[in-house]
Amino acid sequence: MSAVGNILSMIKSLSAAEKRELKMMLLENASATMSDMESFMTDERFAGGMVCPHCGCLHVVRNGHQESNGKQRYLCRDCGKSFDITSNSIVSGTHKGLDVWERYIACMMQGLSLRKTAEICEIHRNTAFNWRHKILDALQDIEDNVVLNGIVEADETFFAISYKGNHSNGGSFTMPRKPHKRGKEIHTRGLSKEQVCVACAVNRSGKSIGKVSNLGRISTKNVDGVLGDRIDENSTLVTDEMNAYVKFALNRGINLVQVKGGKSKKGIYNVQRVNSYHSSLSKFMRGFNGVATKYLNGYLAWHNFMKYSKHTDAERKQLLLRRVLTLPKKVVCKEISNRDALAFAV
């Protein structure tokens, strides 16, 4: 047996506590050097040559090094702006080496708490929070390009509206209702405006869409706002008997099959996959002890990436590194906490 085989056999004999301890030790020692990550970022972001991240032009020259950290800087001869390899990305202006970001992503992949992640990455808890939402914002941009084809099942699920995190916004936030007592459930009957509707769709190859659509009962306009242009016109849409989908499918020219309430299927069609998606999403969200509604879309994208993408954990980590860190998107920390309490049209 190889050395790796011997190690794997030994790991199987460890207790649950010992396995957790080993995982923490590996995470703390698995990060690449800063120079390795800078080379990685340069290769991934500028594989075809140096391009200005501000205007996209190719007329770029070297422009010395940054005094604080020694990073190579560049100057665009067209727009006159200077930049480094991280400019106009989510890691821009974070004042941490890219090796710390790799360690952070490893913690995120393991589902570690912000407190534990901050400890391992040697950053403040507030920084860990902001980094999470920078990554989730970039992940949303990627997930928004997912288009479903084949047999697509669609249905809604609901979360209680949460104004968590809005009360400290410099007095600019006013609660639109009386606060609920801790641990008390919402007592409004039916699908009230206290319920956040999440429109969901899953196809049989495992691709998924999940996004906040509205408050209360979903309408055709709400369905189109989430699923419009994201379901191939040659697909078959399978739903329950909700009327909102009838007009949506008609307007989009999509074949619609509706399964009657109380029935598990209609021929080869059913809504079992989207129901399973709801269960998976509910379990995933419980791990965060309440998510503010203004951040909900980010967690939906995270769930889809982790649970409904056919990749190994190692492949997911590489995808996050290659696509999320290099995505041309800048997120300012102050903007994260100051987002609207309801990040969608009510």
What do the PLM-derived regions correspond to, one by one?
Residues M1-V346:
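Residue-level recognition of single "structural anchor" positions
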